[in-house]
Amino acid sequence: MSIKIAIDAMGGDHGIKVTVPASLEALSKFSDISIVLVGNQPLIEAELANHKYDKNRLSVEHAEQIVEMDDLPSKALRNKRKSSMRIALNLVKDDVAQACVSAGNTGALMAVSKFVLKTLPGIDRPAICTQMPTMKGHVHVLDLGANVGADGQSLAQFAVMGSVLAQAVDSNSRPRVGLLNIGEEEIKGHQRIKDANEILKSSDAINYVGYVEGDEIFKGDVDVVSCDGFDGNVALKASEGVAKMISFYLRAAFNKNLLTKLAGLVVYPVLKAFKAKVDPRRYNGASFLGLRKIVIKSHGGADVFSFYHAIAEARLEVNKNVPELIATEVKAILETH
């Protein structure tokens, strides 16, 4: 199967300086994909001139406009119809491409994606989902900011979508799914969390294990965590901050004097493995779950390594037919309510 991925080449903080080389890296790693770079054609072709690549597997689609990182979603929808983001999504809508990857404005990308691609039947709100490292591997957490104040029905839908994604990309036939809460007791939490808990307990569609607290996200005892967008975004940013703090203190400790520097050389392979494990760049590529087609959001400040991983995530989800699987599972759980 040949997969075509539409890249919003102008999106993000670094634009074509990141998206073009990352796309070429993906082409070199995956023989089953082709890429269409959407954006300012003269600028993209000037950047491509600095690289060697298979011209049969890469094309350029010109776009006159760019969705800026500070553009309101409404502006992106109404006034940026010829933007690289909008055209890339249109290519997916028209089945020219099977997935879109963008490092652009998150709010704008979600709004335009919902307008162009629409949501799956039974899905009220799409959710942003990404992987976070744990003691035993990784966990899929959603929502990460698209939905603040999600109701119980939406939280239950997030749980189902996250479970489907974990089954597909991790080959996990029965992923353990939890609801983020301030305690494990039934009486704790907002009413919407309690409502989602009741919905999920009454269904056999997923392997629901109950409430999980914030510290349990990283233990590796659950594979999926469903939460409100506000809570999820705070958890994600806090985990990234803690990883940076630990790295800072480790560097400071091993650079203290000659003896600690020598000790650092001895344990360098261990530290390198640790850094790779918690490096957020490896987990770049958040899925917009609940849409009819695949959209992957890269971090706005992504470097080439990070953006490459977002493209790899898009390829994986196309291969696994994630939207179709989500539609089937959501239908099953809705039929019980």
UniProtKB/Swiss-Prot annotation:
Keywords noted in UniProt: Cytoplasm, Lipid biosynthesis, Lipid metabolism, Phospholipid biosynthesis, Phospholipid metabolism, Transferase
Pathways involved: Lipid metabolism; phospholipid metabolism
A GO cellular component entry from the record: cytoplasm
Subunit description: Homodimer. Probably interacts with PlsY.
Chemical reaction(s) catalysed: a fatty acyl-[ACP] + phosphate = an acyl phosphate + holo-[ACP]
Annotated organism of origin: Hydrogenovibrio crunogenus (strain DSM 25203 / XCL-2)
Pfam families: FA_synthesis (PF02504)
Gene it is expressed from: plsX
Family designation: Belongs to the PlsX family.
Main location class: cytoplasm
EC number: 2.3.1.274
Domain of life: Bacteria
Purpose: Catalyzes the reversible formation of acyl-phosphate (acyl-PO(4)) from acyl-[acyl-carrier-protein] (acyl-ACP). This enzyme utilizes acyl-ACP as fatty acyl donor, but not acyl-CoA.
HAMAP family: PlsX
Classification via InterPro entries: FA_synthesis, Phospholipid_synth_PlsX-like
First-level EC class: transferase
GO biological process: fatty acid biosynthetic process; phospholipid biosynthetic process
Single GO MF annotation: phosphate:acyl-[acyl carrier protein] acyltransferase activity
Subcellular location: Cytoplasm
Protein name as catalogued: Phosphate acyltransferase
